Amino acid sequence: NRMLLDKLQGKIDSAAVEYVFSREIWQSAGGFVHFPMAWCSDDATWAAFARHAGGVISLPGQPVCWRNVEGANISNSAGHDKDNLHATILFLRWMRNMFSDYVDDPELINALQCYIHTILRISLHKHYNICGLWGVSMALGRFNKRAAFTTFFRNFRLFS
């Protein structure tokens, strides 16, 4: 799923309002994927929809602009960092189950490491504890143990 890999690697910067889908796809995929605070839910949902639809079609033109008011979007609120980290772990577990055929795919492992890096350092602004880092690393370990330990030790240095 090229769209998913590009999204995980940060090559696509998109928001939920930019996706259009049919009721048929929504029903066949089981609706929206639910995680706490809707964190990672859009990425998981679009991946599931794309899998059921056989891909995603991009329309040419200008990107969609929408307002993201600071403090009004629960997913961006620093007060929910613990919930967001837990949702990230659930997302990684969901990815492992949904894409079990690609567990050993180096491109997927790299994309997941990029995604985790972005979440820990940018989205969560480094507001997480060692237990949270361990949890995310172990969830990644369900794909690749080496990537899990690399991720853990790379981010562990922030606690020193």
Describe these PLM feature segments.
Residues 38, 62-70, 76-105, 130-141:
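Catalytic core of nucleotide-sugar-dependent glycosyltransferases
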Residues 32, 55-56, 101, 118, ...:
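A general structural signal for well-ordered secondary-structure junctions
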Residues 120-160:
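Membrane-interface aromatic/basic loop that binds lipid-linked glycans or pyrophosphate carriers
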Residues 1-79:
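Conserved nucleotide-sugar donor-binding catalytic segment
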